[in-house]
């Protein structure tokens, strides 16, 4: 069972439908016990970093997610959810993140020919093979964002070119992040979610 974190700031239903499509049992929940009992979690996110962290904190979900990560169970952050995995952000004001992956969130440079927010399809360049990236090449995925994750290269598993080289996917241990929306990226997005399914099943088997 995968729990999609419900904190009133995410595209939970579209992610749930995508997981249903690939046969991955899931539920949308903010219940601490359900989250900790899950085989893995997906942290969605749409909106601003400070408000999202405030809402996670108000519900005590920041502590729950850190406990989940410490257990070694898989986690996938999507769009803003990926950014929340990092240590901090400059969006509107300096705000601490969950600190699960080293890095800082910065605004995309507003340069001629590169609109901010970045909305639309962009090509992936795979930097490292993982269960989520092993079937990917130069496919296009769908983005909607104004900020990006500035993190050490060792945690970047895919990028896309824009006004800067945007870390498209990041990874540390069983924690993954996707800056784009897999649930809106067609078949290639489903392949990424299948990779996360593989990680959760492998982790579950090793813990039994």
UniProtKB/Swiss-Prot annotation:
HAMAP family given in the database record: HisH
Subunit and partners: Heterodimer of HisH and HisF.
Localization per Swiss-Prot or TrEMBL: Cytoplasm
Underlying gene: hisH
Any one Pfam family match given in the protein's UniProt record, by short name: GATase
Matching PROSITE patterns: GATASE_TYPE_1
Descriptive protein name: Imidazole glycerol phosphate synthase subunit HisH
Keywords recorded for this protein, A-Z: Amino-acid biosynthesis, Cytoplasm, Glutamine amidotransferase, Histidine biosynthesis, Hydrolase, Lyase
GO function terms (MF aspect): glutaminase activity; imidazoleglycerol-phosphate synthase activity; lyase activity
Organism: Listeria innocua serovar 6a (strain ATCC BAA-680 / CLIP 11262)
